[in-house]
């Protein structure tokens, strides 16, 4: 049975080591009505996801401890989190990076810099398609 959630109360976990990015995204999404939690360490990301139980994850690829691909795999290996959509946020835009992000379980790929409005559109689209609104 597919769970239905309201977009306005969806929980978003932002995993990025750049405070200027996380601050902007957290503020914008909170003002849009989302419940937002931030994790700056990729090593702690899977544990934070298990604790927070997000409806969607925003994940940077270039992180210092583990890259976003490894982090995505760690999250997807958890049975409780396996179906949570992951949107990669990255400064990388090579075709092989995009392909690899999908191969490890990512659902979308957004290149930095991005507009908050576009990010919101993509989050809404992913939530609607995942949770069958």
PLM regions: where:
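Charged docking surfaces used in two-component/phosphorelay signaling
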Residues: 23-31
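Active-site beta3 strand of CheY-like receiver
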Residues: 52-58
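C-terminal output helix
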Residues: 114-124
């Amino acid at each position: 049975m597919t769970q239905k959630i309201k977009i306005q109360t969806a929980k978003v976990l932002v995993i990025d080591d750049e405070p200027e990015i996380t601050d902007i995204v957290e503020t914008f999404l909170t003002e849009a009505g989302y419940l937002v939690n931030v994790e700056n360490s990729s090593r702690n990301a899977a544990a934070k996801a298990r604790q927070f139980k997000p409806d969607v994850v925003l994940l940077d690829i270039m992180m210092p401890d583990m890259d976003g691909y490894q982090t995505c795999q760690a999250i997807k290996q958890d049975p409780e989190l396996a179906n949570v959509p992951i949107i990669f946020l990255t400064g990388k835009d090579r075709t092989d990076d995009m392909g690899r992000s999908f191969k490890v379980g990512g659902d979308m790929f957004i290149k930095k810099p991005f507009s908050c409005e576009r990010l919101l559109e993509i989050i809404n689209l992913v939530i609607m398609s995942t949770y069958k609104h």
